């Protein structure tokens, strides 16, 4: 898995919630994003610039994040992100510190491979799930999950329960559809003509 470096500055938490809300508003006003690092027994509050998160957030790839908080380096993953409901700005980010001995849960992008039989027959291949949630040690998690669809016929689907990847436990619902070959009008017309 690729890694990306993010630099942050530690911050203290105000005792009263009104002071904390004011402080967070000031951070966002100055182009910063409040962040929290969980794991390893302690919770660390820090601030990162909006630009510092851009390459991590606005990408289809997954990364191990090399966090540098005031010189202290930690490996983490992006756990949660909150956006402003109207402006779509990043409001808050949660990171989770990686423990090399414990498995982590992460969403991994899906890549389809091959030309489906149903597409050759006039159907349309539709990717229903862009990411699948997996559980594994972080050094086993791949950058993407490749699903071969060359066997997929018209009207057929691939479900999460039908997939298996070495060293990964699939957490997503087993009945969730990953991809399907849907009938197009042209394919329905050809099937009706062949049936006459």
Curated annotation (Swiss-Prot):
InterPro entries: Rbsml_bL25/Gln-tRNA_synth_N (IPR020056), Ribosomal_bL25/Gln-tRNA_synth (IPR011035), Ribosomal_bL25_b-dom (IPR020057), Ribosomal_bL25_C (IPR037121), Ribosomal_bL25_long (IPR001021), Ribosomal_L25_dom (IPR029751), Ribosomal_uL5_bac-type (IPR020930). The gene is rplY. This is one of the proteins that binds to the 5S RNA in the ribosome where it forms part of the central protuberance. This is Large ribosomal subunit protein bL25. One of its GO terms (biological process) is translation. It comes from the Bacteria. GO terms for cellular component: cytosolic large ribosomal subunit. It comes from Bacteroides thetaiotaomicron (strain ATCC 29148 / DSM 2079 / JCM 5827 / CCUG 10774 / NCTC 10582 / VPI-5482 / E50). Belongs to the bacterial ribosomal protein bL25 family. CTC subfamily. HAMAP family: Ribosomal_bL25_CTC (MF_01334). One of its GO terms (molecular function) is structural constituent of ribosome. Gene3D superfamilies: Ribosomal protein L25, beta domain, Ribosomal Protein L25, Chain P. Part of the 50S ribosomal subunit; part of the 5S rRNA/L5/L18/L25 subcomplex. Contacts the 5S rRNA. Binds to the 5S rRNA independently of L5 and L18. Keywords: Ribonucleoprotein, Ribosomal protein, RNA-binding, rRNA-binding.
């Amino acid at each position: 898995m690729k890694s990306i470096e993010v630099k942050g500055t530690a911050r203290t938490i105000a005792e009263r919630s009104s002071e904390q809300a004011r402080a967070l508003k000031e951070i966002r006003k100055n182009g910063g994003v409040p962040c929290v690092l969980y794991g390893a027994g302690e919770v660390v509050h820090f601030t990162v610039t909006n630009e510092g998160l851009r390459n991590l957030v606005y990408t289809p790839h997954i990364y191990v994040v090399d966090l540098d908080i005031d010189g202290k380096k930690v490996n983490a993953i992006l756990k949660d992100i909150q956006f402003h409901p109207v402006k779509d700005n990043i409001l808050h980010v949660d990171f989770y510190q990686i423990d090399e001995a414990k498995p982590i849960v992460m969403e991994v992008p899906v890549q389809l491979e091959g030309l489906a039989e149903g597409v050759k027959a006039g159907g349309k291949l539709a990717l229903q799930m862009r990411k699948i949630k997996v559980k594994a040690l972080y050094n086993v998690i791949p950058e993407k999950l490749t699903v071969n669809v060359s066997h997929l016929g018209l009207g057929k689907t691939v479900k999460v329960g039908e997939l298996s990847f070495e060293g990964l436990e699939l957490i997503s619902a087993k009945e969730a559809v990953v991809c399907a070959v849907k009938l197009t009008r042209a394919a329905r017309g050809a099937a009706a003509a062949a049936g006459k």
